């Protein structure tokens, strides 16, 4: 999955990554099944990342179509081509709620199908950098 909604910060005295995943995303199954998730950052590869963001791994082997190479880091999948990889331990999962939106136009613009994102907060436990 290519993510564009997320943030890094400090919460509950921990360095954290906060990510948002829609319920219909294939990636959600994998994140839900594991206690950890990875975030992979790239210097370039914009065309490849755009392709990955518009295709589902449920329908095709999209990773091989962009010639990325999966590798395991501390038992977690990432890509050899990534510049940096964050290993995150899940510490919170919740779902956005329609009634909590204070600006109705945000909800209307982003959720016409009422498919509200799930929020995952992960403690950043390791960071790896490729040279």
PLM feature segments, named:
Residues 1-131:
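Active-site-proximal mixed secondary-structure blocks
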